[in-house]
């Protein structure tokens, strides 16, 4: 009981030392609970069965991510406990001097960890429960759901999971603390804070060579990620993508290692700056620990890089996948059937019923299955493919240059061709602009920007197409926006619209039927879709190969995938950001503890408090900014890579999400910086 009371007294006395530790634990618990309680928030949402499936998948993935997050938080808690033991080394040394056994000191630490853990769990869970109510609004917004049934929710499963995971973490910390105390020597505990790392000036020539090599390797890694799917064959495989990642990690370490030897040497030669104010003291302070911070700086830099990229990308995913759905899925349902003649081998693999149905249109099949009566606003068209019009033919004389710039394109794939009258009927249904053509003109419609840009190269050069001996020329010098089939993203790489007579006598490649349901309300449409999908699914691969795609399914999968990526990104991003900032904060607080005597010496020789505070501020600022600056440089190229990928989903700008990411960094990272500075000021003022 006496040791327990002493533990409470120690916590009360050292409340300032525990501030960042406690704050980080509370944030960790709250975030862990919030993201594991998402399933409880979705229960109240009025969503379709397709969306419910996506939500269940998302919660399963978040559960898996939580295991990874628990390892990160566990490492962070152990790292923080090392700081607290070091901070109180003299106190423990006095306990040993007074005759207290190491077992009792371990017991004191056990009680302290237990108390801090229990309080942080309680406060963190309370904060998490409050934040999870706000998360309900975000989840509802993500899934465009009705929140009329909103009510206060508490996830017992998330709470139990949080208690279990963090209890295991605290137990590991207790074991770790016991091992540390048992290995400590009395002299180290009493005088450990007076030890300092000897400043070792690395060979500047070697450092310069290493720095140049690192910059070249990093530049090559940047080139690879910005040249994705371009001229570099390395980026065409998963293993190839790992090459710039490995180069980036190694180069980051080498840059920090080389700069740790160059910065001090360079600054010492800048005598006007070096001897101004307390700059010489500040530089020496930074250098005194520089050799042990290279690896940790590398890890923190990479974590910050990951945070910036994942925030910037994840916050754009939702808009990327759901922002243009009204244009991409303008009708309720679309059916399609291949019309090309079956080969002998294919006929042997299909049943008699399928072969009989194969030569009919989608409309015929729907009428036979008694599905057509559920549809209205019906438009059916054919698409065509001919051997003489491939992607290579569409590029004409520009094929050589385009082939060099984009070697991975499938140039021998036949182009999709559509009659002008068919397209205009479909465009009218889709609320798209109708087209007009002369007898010798064609238009290419595409909404996939990257492919449209490539096609525009040949269109600007008036590339002709030849069908049945007749030449056709582009009406426009660029692709026109348009779609034929429903999709969840802007992936129409190009469809060629031709005058009707150009395709007369050619056998159709595919028959497409687009329509709306004979229903008005959302609930009625969902009921009709259930009926239609059940009928089609029951007959598919039995007596028909009719396939279909629906607006409801597209919305559910696109919005669900966007929400999934966003939540996982936010979860990992916040944890990585907190971990990076907390590690730096604890390291700086530890250094402030080590250097307390040096700051006291400055006071004794007459240095005013303002200069001391400025020196402390500069020292902490360098440690916080150093990894952040390199992470930002990495992120410029990482975001460029992410932007390329996002363009395939319809997003062309990450500006808004980058601004939001900057806000996150300023609030969380900047907040830790300020707390570290003010806590360090308090530490160095202690006598």
Where are these regions (language model features)?
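Short cytosolic juxtamembrane segments of multi-pass membrane proteins
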Residues: 1-5, 184-199, 593-594, 682-687
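Small-residue-rich transmembrane alpha-helices
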Residues: 30-44, 79-83, 116-145, 158-183, ...
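Selective transmembrane-helix segments that form parts of the transport pathway or gating/packing helices
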Residues: 15-21, 109-127, 163, 167, ...
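Peri-transmembrane interface segments
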Residues: 16-23, 34-68, 83-86, 94, ...
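Nucleotide-cofactor and metal-assisted catalytic machinery
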Residues: 325-563
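N-terminal Sec/SRP start-transfer signal
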Residues: 1-29, 197-213, 257-304, 594
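Alpha-helical transmembrane segments
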Residues: 30-63, 138, 258-259, 305-331, ...
């Amino acid at each position: 009981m006496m040791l327990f009371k002493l533990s409470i007294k120690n916590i009360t006395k050292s409340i300032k030392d525990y501030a960042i530790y406690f704050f980080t634990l509370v944030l960790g618990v709250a975030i862990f609970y919030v993201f594991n309680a998402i399933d409880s928030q979705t229960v109240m949402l009025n969503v379709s069965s397709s969306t419910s499936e996506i939500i269940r998948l998302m919660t399963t993935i978040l559960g898996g991510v939580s295991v990874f997050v628990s390892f990160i938080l566990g490492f962070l808690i152990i790292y923080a406990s090392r700081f607290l033991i070091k901070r109180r080394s003299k106190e423990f040394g006095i306990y040993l001097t007074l005759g207290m056994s190491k077992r009792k000191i371990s017991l004191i630490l056990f009680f302290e960890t237990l108390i801090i853990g229990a309080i942080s769990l309680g406060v963190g869970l309370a904060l998490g429960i409050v934040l999870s109510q706000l998360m309900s609004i975000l989840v509802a917004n993500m899934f465009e759901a009705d929140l009329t049934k909103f009510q206060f929710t508490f996830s017992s499963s998330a709470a139990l999971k949080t208690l279990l995971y963090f209890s295991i973490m605290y137990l590991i910390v207790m074991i770790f603390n016991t091992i540390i105390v048992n290995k400590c020597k009395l002299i180290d505990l009493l005088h450990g804070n007076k030890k300092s790392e000897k400043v070792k000036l690395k060979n500047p020539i070697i450092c310069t060579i290493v720095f140049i090599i690192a910059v070249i390797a990093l530049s090559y890694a940047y080139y690879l990620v910005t040249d994705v799917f371009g001229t570099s064959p390395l980026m065409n495989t998963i293993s190839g993508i790992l090459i710039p990642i490995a180069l980036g990690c190694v180069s980051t370490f080498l840059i920090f290692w080389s700069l740790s030897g160059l910065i001090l040497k360079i600054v010492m030669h800048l005598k006007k700056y070096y001897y101004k104010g307390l700059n010489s003291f500040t530089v020496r302070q930074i250098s005194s620990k520089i050799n042990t911070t290279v690896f940790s700086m590398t890890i923190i830099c990479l974590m910050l890089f990951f945070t910036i990229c994942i925030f910037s990308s994840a916050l754009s995913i939702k808009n990327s996948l759901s922002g243009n759905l009204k244009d991409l899925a303008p009708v309720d349902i679309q059916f399609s059937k291949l019309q090309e003649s079956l080969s002998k081998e294919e006929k042997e693999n299909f049943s008699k019923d399928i072969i009989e149905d194969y030569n009919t249109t989608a409309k015929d099949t729907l009428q036979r299955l008694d599905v057509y009566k559920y549809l209205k606003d019906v438009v059916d068209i054919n698409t065509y493919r001919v051997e003489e019009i491939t992607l290579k033919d569409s590029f004409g004389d520009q094929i050589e240059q385009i082939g060099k710039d984009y070697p991975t394109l499938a140039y021998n794939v036949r182009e999709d061709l559509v009659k002008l009258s068919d397209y205009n009927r479909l465009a009218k249904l889709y609320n798209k602009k109708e087209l007009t053509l002369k007898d010798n003109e064609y238009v290419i419609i595409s909404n996939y920007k990257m492919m449209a840009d490539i096609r525009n190269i040949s269109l600007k050069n008036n590339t002709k197409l030849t069908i049945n001996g007749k030449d056709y020329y582009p009406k426009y010098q660029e692709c026109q926006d348009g779609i034929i089939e429903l999709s969840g993203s802007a992936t129409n790489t190009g469809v060629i619209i031709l005058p009707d007579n150009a395709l007369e006598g050619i056998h159709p490649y595919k028959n497409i039927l687009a329509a709306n349901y004979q229903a008005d309300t959302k609930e009625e449409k969902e009921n009709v879709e259930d009926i239609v999908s059940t009928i089609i699914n029951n007959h598919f691969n039995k007596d028909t190969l009719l396939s279909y795609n629906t607006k409801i399914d597209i919305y559910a999968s696109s919005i669900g995938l966007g929400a999934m990526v966003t939540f996982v990104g936010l979860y990992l991003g916040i944890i990585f950001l907190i971990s990076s900032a907390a590690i730096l904060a604890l390291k700086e607080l530890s250094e402030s503890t080590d250097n307390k005597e040096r700051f006291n010496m400055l006071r004794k020789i007459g240095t005013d408090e303002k200069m001391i505070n400025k020196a402390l501020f500069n020292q902490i600022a360098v440690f916080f900014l150093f990894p952040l600056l390199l992470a930002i440089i990495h992120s410029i190229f990482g975001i460029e890579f992410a932007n390329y990928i996002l363009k395939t989903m319809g997003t062309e700008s990450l500006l808004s999400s980058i601004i939001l990411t900057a806000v996150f960094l300023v609030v969380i990272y900047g907040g830790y910086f300020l707390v570290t500075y003010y806590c360090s000021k308090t530490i160095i003022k202690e006598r």
